[in-house]
Each structure stands twice: as C-alpha cells, then as structure tokens.
C-alpha cells in the first residue's frame, strides 16, 4: 500500500529520528490533508503506536469522589456552580467508599483507578482522606492509583505520593491561546504549576484536554506541543459532550472522522506516550469506537464518567479482544 507522501515521510521521520522528531509546522501539515489521505494518517499512526507502545492497552477508571458546586467557570463542565444543571452536589466520599469502588473496578478488569473531585482544590483534611484511601487501594488491588483533585500545594502532593498515589491527573483542557474563551476563574499557568508541583513530589503526570470546544486545528497542535514541552507521562483525549445547562450546550458534536484525526495527530506528536480516550467517546464515535486503536490510541476510560454514564466494561473488553489486540 502506498501512503500519502506527506504522511509517509513524517511517519518515517518519527520512526527513524525518535519521539520528538516532528516540528510544529510539520504537525500542522497533518491537519491540512485531503479527505482521501485520512485513512493513510490512521494507518501510519497505528504503525507509530505499535513501534513505540506495542499493543499494551491501558484501561482507566474514575470515581466522582466529590461532586458539583465548583467555583470555576469552565464552559463545558456540568459541575460548575456558574451553570444551571441537575448535577448532584455531594461532599467528599469516605475513604471506605472509595476503596470499595476501586476493588469493584479492579475485579472488572480496570488497570488504573482515579479519584476525581470537583472544585479548585481540596483542603488538608480531604487530602488526608484521599491519601488513606490510596494507601488501602494500593495494598489490596492490582490498580495503579491516580488522583485528580484540582490545584496542588507541595505538601498535598507529597501526602498523596506517600499514600500510594502514582499518577496525578490535571488537564490543560485546551491551548493557552484559547483558554480564556473556556475559563476565566484561573490562569493557564496555574494548571502548569500544579503539574510541576506534582512532578517534583515524584508523581507521574497525566494531562490532556477536550476537543470540540471551538478551538482551531492549530490550537490543537499548540496544546500538544505544550504537553510535549512538559513531558507528561500520559495524555487523556476527551471529546465535548454538550451537556444541558452549560455554556457549551448548543455546540455540535465533533464528526467521528475528525475525532479520530485528533487521535492520530496526537500520536504523531507523542509517539511514545499512552493516549487515553476518555469523555465523549461513545457519543462522538458511536460505531467507530473500535477505530481508536487504528488511529493511534493505546487506552481508554472504562465504566462511568464523572456526571454521565459510560458503557459496560465487558463491552469494551470484548471490543479490544475482538479487534486489533
């Protein structure tokens, strides 16, 4: 099979010269391909994934450990107190409740488990509860324990690390140049600072964003290169699910092929990093969900999301086992 010449040249460059071979302008050229070349992009992204990531699949799971009443005004989020939604407001779950859910998801086949909380940050007592839960989960399951708790201080990051948290998740959400259109209650640099604090404490970094917010293709590349500069350890890719009551409620879903092209683009820019397909997968990709691996993905969230329902974990495991893996 003869691939599109641009796709083939850039893919070979990545295979020959290493994970950071692609320049910003070369990445942008992949967003300007004719429609007939998009399948070639997927095949090349799959080849890059297999070269750097083999066929290992990461199955992430998350728990909404504290829900609603967030002071931030992120345009897409149903948990923001600036939006009128039907999200249930709930304080932090007990450590026991978090441990129980982790054990259930471990039995179901998840490989990572993340405790996720609404709000800008947790207080010291809440951090202690999460740390206690993480310690028990680490000892009683096979799961890699993750946390997504908003902004961090050095002391809170150190407590999480001591408790057994391995990965800290904190999305940039979008490009720096587009961020003011999405959130005005905190600065982009605060998110980057949290990632740096987490890394200094010895936590691995999981950071990505949401696509379909109105950002341009160049801004998608911009965020990818910011993540590359930060050298994050894994990258979650979300697609906007326009929820009633949010400022994004009337936005259209990304077309499935465009969503898959985003995945392939990020595989070219991040050849050796796990790309995890997360929120909006089912509603955006529909019958094309199994194509995520062809497009370069190496993992996904299984089970439910924060405020929306996912599909049965068994269905996703069957999809993987009967597909490319």
Curated annotation (Swiss-Prot):
InterPro entries, per the entry: Aldolase_TIM, BATS_dom, Biotin_synth/BioAB, Biotin_synthase, Elp3/MiaA/NifB-like_rSAM, rSAM
PROSITE patterns for this protein: RADICAL_SAM
* One Gene Ontology molecular-function label: 4 iron, 4 sulfur cluster binding
Matching entries from CDD domains are given as: Radical_SAM
Share an example GO biological-process annotation for this protein. biotin biosynthetic process
Q: Which cofactor does it need?
A: [4Fe-4S] cluster; [2Fe-2S] cluster
Q: Which UniProt keywords apply?
A: 2Fe-2S, 4Fe-4S, Biotin biosynthesis, Iron, Iron-sulfur, Metal-binding, S-adenosyl-L-methionine, Transferase
Its Enzyme Commission number? Answer: 2.8.1.6
**Binding locations of [2Fe-2S] cluster:** 114, 146, 206
List, alphabetically, the SUPFAM superfamilies matched: Radical SAM enzymes
Domain Radical SAM core per the UniProt entry, residue ranges: 52-281
Q: Fill in the subunit field for this protein.
A: Homodimer.
The task this protein performs is described as: Catalyzes the conversion of dethiobiotin (DTB) to biotin by the insertion of a sulfur atom into dethiobiotin via a radical-based mechanism.
The name on file for this protein is Biotin synthase
């Amino acid at each position: 099979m003869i691939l599109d010449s641009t796709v083939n040249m850039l893919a070979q460059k990545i295979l020959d010269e290493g994970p950071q071979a692609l320049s910003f302008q070369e990445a942008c050229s992949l967003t300007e391909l004719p429609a007939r070349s998009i399948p070639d992009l997927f095949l090349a992204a799959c080849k890059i994934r297999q070269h750097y990531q083999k066929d290992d699949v990461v199955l992430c799971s998350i728990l909404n450990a504290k829900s609603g009443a967030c002071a931030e005004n992120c345009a897409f989020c149903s948990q923001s107190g600036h939006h009128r939604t039907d999200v249930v407001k709930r304080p932090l779950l007990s450590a026991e409740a978090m441990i129980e859910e982790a054990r259930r998801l471990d039995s179901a086949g998840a490989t990572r488990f993340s405790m996720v909380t609404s709000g800008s940050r947790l207080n010291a007592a809440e951090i202690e509860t999460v740390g206690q839960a993480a310690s028990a989960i680490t000892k009683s399951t096979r799961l890699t324990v993750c946390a997504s708790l908003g902004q961090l201080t050095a002391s809170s990051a150190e407590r999480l690390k001591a408790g057994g948290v391995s990965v800290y998740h904190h999305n940039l959400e979008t490009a720096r140049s587009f961020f003011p259109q999405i959130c005005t209650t905190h600065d982009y640099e605060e998110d980057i600072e949290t990632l740096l604090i987490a890394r200094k404490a010895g936590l691995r970094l999981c950071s990505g964003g949401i696509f379909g917010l109105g950002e341009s293709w160049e801004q998608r590349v911009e965020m990818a290169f910011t993540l590359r500069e930060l050298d994050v350890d894994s990258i979650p890719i979300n697609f906007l699910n326009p929820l009633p009551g949010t400022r994004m409620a009337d936005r259209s879903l990304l077309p499935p092929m465009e969503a898959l092209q985003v995945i392939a683009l990020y595989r070219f820019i991040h050849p050796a990093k796990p790309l995890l397909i997360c929120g909006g997968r089912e509603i955006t990709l529909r019958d094309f969900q199994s194509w995520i691996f062809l497009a370069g993905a190496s993992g996904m969230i299984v089970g439910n999301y924060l405020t929306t329902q996912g599909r049965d974990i068994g269905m996703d495991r069957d999809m993987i086992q009967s597909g490319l893996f």
